[in-house]
């Protein structure tokens, strides 16, 4: 019986177009107290270290995504536009690729989508899900200037809209975040 259950679960994950987020509660979840992040080996597309310690002192949005996750890929253009708009105001926008193919997959996806502003960041050891307690993709972590997680958004969001911008400005200003500040879920696209 356990084998059948395992095979059924494995089959559900293999269905094309299904991201993990469809199986979890979606939206903004604000922590009662900031949470420290575990250690993770993050690299840029040249294989150089690009971990969280490289941007401490600024609040950050860290989006965990994979090229096989359609909602993740559909969300990337909004994150690209958000980065261009909000980084000059003092926040970092990081798209952390969790693909097995690493930087190659991220570079190819960014090229296909004409992503201009996001930099390639890769979970080199593919442990982000475990280290950050992220069971579904896409998941976005919101970090304060001390590098502590204050909230997370589960599912694809319209980050470049007015609510996404307002949420990021509240994070930059070190104001308390509340669930009603959540940007809307991104609308699915047929060919991200």
Give residue ranges: language-model regions.
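N-terminal export signals
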Residues: 5-21
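N-terminal "domain-start" segment that seeds a small globular fold
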Residues: 22-52
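Short loop/turn microsegments at loop-to-beta-strand junctions
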Residues: 37-38, 60, 137-139
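Non-globular targeting/processing and membrane-anchoring segments
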Residues: 174-192
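Structural microenvironment flanking redox-active thiols in thiol-disulfide oxidoreductases
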Residues: 74-113, 124-130
């Amino acid at each position: 019986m356990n084998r059948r259950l395992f095979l059924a679960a494995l089959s559900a994950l293999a269905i094309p177009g299904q991201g993990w987020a469809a199986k979890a509660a979606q939206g903004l979840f604000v922590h009662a107290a900031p949470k420290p992040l575990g250690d993770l080996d993050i690299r840029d597309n040249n294989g150089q270290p690009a971990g969280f310690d490289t941007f401490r002192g600024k609040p950050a949005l860290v989006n965990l995504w994979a090229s096989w996750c359609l909602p993740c890929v559909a969300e990337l253009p909004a994150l690209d536009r958000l980065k261009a708009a909000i980084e000059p105001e003092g926040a970092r926008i990081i798209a952390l690729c969790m693909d097995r193919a690493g930087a190659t997959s991220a570079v190819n996806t960014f090229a296909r989508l004409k992503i201009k502003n996001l930099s390639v960041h890769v979970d080199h050891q593919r442990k982000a899900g475990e280290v950050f307690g992220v069971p579904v993709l896409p998941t976005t972590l919101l970090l304060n200037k001390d590098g502590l997680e204050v909230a997370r958004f589960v599912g694809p969001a319209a980050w470049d809209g007015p609510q996404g911008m307002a949420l990021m400005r509240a994070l930059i200003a070190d104001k308390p975040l509340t669930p009603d500040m959540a940007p809307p879920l991104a609308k699915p696209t047929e060919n991200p």
